[in-house]
Regions:
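Hydrophobic h-region of N-terminal signal peptides that target proteins for export
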Residues: 6-18
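A short beta-strand motif characteristic of beta-propeller blades
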Residues: 45-58, 91-98, 131-135
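Conserved beta-strand positions in repeat-built beta-propeller and related beta-rich domains
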Residues: 22-33, 68-69, 74-80, 114-119
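Mid-chain, structured segments of secreted extracytoplasmic proteins
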Residues: 59-91
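Structural motif
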Residues: 31-38, 83-86, 121-127
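N-terminal, post-signal-peptide region of Sec/Tat-exported proteins
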Residues: 39-72
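Repeated scaffold domains used in trafficking and secretory/extracellular systems
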Residues: 58-67, 101-111
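A charged, solvent-exposed segment within the mature domains of Sec-exported extracytoplasmic proteins
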Residues: 104-135
Length: 135
């Protein structure tokens, strides 16, 4: 049996205090639970396992998309884990959703996160995440 290896890279660039920062998302191998985030600051690699370094846990299985909702909140689709992970720009976990099947892409209007799934949906970032992000 052949093992199918898929790799997809998505990134978000953020500018904080005059520094150019890039967060690169790597989906890893399907069903291997090895998705990662790399973090670059001013053109230099800081970490290739940034989420794990900051949060002391894995990101999840097959992350697909990353989007900055506002200056204080970033959302990440973790497709095979069926979650949307919310982090702050410094990489700390803020909140996550549960049971969001087939989540692959994200869109935002700065307040809501829109996720196309099999049944169509609009997911509001968890209240505590938005409260932290707007204060």
């Amino acid at each position: 049996m052949k093992k199918l290896i898929l790799s997809l890279l998505c990134s978000v660039a953020i500018n904080i205090y005059g520094q150019e920062r890039i967060i690169l998302l790597n989906e890893g191998n399907w069903q291997a639970d090895n998705g990662k985030m790399s973090y670059f600051e001013d053109g230099k690699v800081v970490s290739n396992q940034w989420f794990r370094d900051v949060n002391k846990r894995k990101l999840g299985d097959t992350p697909n998309d990353i989007i900055q909702i506002n200056k204080n909140l970033i959302a990440i689709t973790i497709n095979w884990s069926n979650i949307i992970q919310f982090i702050s720009p410094d990489g700390k976990r803020v909140a996550e959703t549960e049971d969001v099947p087939n989540n692959r892409k994200l869109a935002t209007d700065g307040r809501y996160v829109y996720v196309p799934i099999a049944y169509g949906s609009r997911i509001t970032a968890p209240k505590n995440a938005l409260d932290k992000a707007t204060n």
